[in-house]
Amino acid sequence: MPAQLQTELIRNAPATSIQFEIEPAHNALYSMMLLNVADQLSGLDEWVTRTAQSLSPERRHNNRLVLEGLHYAVTPIRSWNSFEAYLDDLAASDPTELRDRLLERLTTSKVYDLPRGVRPIPSIPPQQLLDKATYMNWLAEKFAGDYDPEIESEAHDYFVEPARMHALIIYHLQTMWREYLRVEWRRVLPMLEEAVTVFRAQDWSKLNALQVARQVTNQELKPYWEGMIERAQHITLIPSAHLGPYLGKFSHDDSLWLLFGAHLPGGARATSSALTRSELLVRLSALNDDTRLQILELLGQRDELCAQDIITLLDISQPAASRHLKQLSATGYVTERRRDANKCYALNRERLDETCDLLHRFLKI
């Protein structure tokens, strides 16, 4: 596409609409997705770690198969008033149409790599992926090892038989909702409703979409997130009870659903203590570990340390260092920047002060 036409599309694109919603379907599905990474991310809500540990091997496997291998067949492409309504619609959907939607999403370009207003086109005719060898080779090229061949191979066995795929998806999601998430959803719903009410009450009119996202998430966003936010024409910001300090997303066409850990916006007051407790638990969880405290202690003594310096000084493995630094960075206790090929970190004293202030306000001392 000529550069001039791309410029025109960007200039003529409508302004971004931003709203705060609970989004039960997106919220519940993402909580189920977190069960697949409970052993990789520290700082997730206790429900996630406890539920992940309680799953049988078969259910744990099926959770990955449905929410990773068949992900785009279950991704909501619109808002739903309840998870049950989403499930009913999914159950009534044509299995072949679901499969074709999965293949179309898989083969289209990453939308955040494209100018705003430009629709992605398939990188390969979707129907070619019905051949397993073609599918597995294409995955190896596209994801460069960042996928599970066993899960993807089994997913392929299902989506070449759409009715079988559909039956697995419906059975698994209905079971997970009924046995694990329905009671938990009722418990956290009042807190999520309060979060949405408080965020809606703030004045966001003078900020662009990227500025709103930074303030809501309380994070300096990486280019990956910035690209998606700047391209989206409809952004729905969704508080999650289970996400901890991390971010999550769903996208479809020009719509982006961005999930963040439920908390209060700066300066706002909660009408109940649940929302403040939730935010405190996320912040204090990052401090409730000897290795993470040692990392903060080191950064308090020096202006900046790179990841390899921390690994050497604390004699810890690279995966352990990465996991701890990811949580500290997401919580805001450290700032991250690139120095050549290295990730380097500095202490964010302001965030530590904010945590102390939040604890004082909560305890009323």
Predicted regions and their residues:
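Short amphipathic alpha-helical segments with coiled-coil-like heptad repeat character
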Residues: 59-63, 245, 353-355
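Alpha-helix boundary/capping and short turn/kink residues
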Residues: 37, 41, 289, 304, ...
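Extended mid-to-C-terminal alpha-helical interaction segments
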Residues: 213-341, 356, 364-365
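N-terminal, charged low-complexity regulatory/assembly segments
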Residues: 1-229
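Basic, amphipathic "hinge/linker" alpha-helix immediately C-terminal to the N-terminal HTH DNA-binding motif
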Residues: 341-360
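Short functional linear motifs
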Residues: 48, 60, 292-293, 352
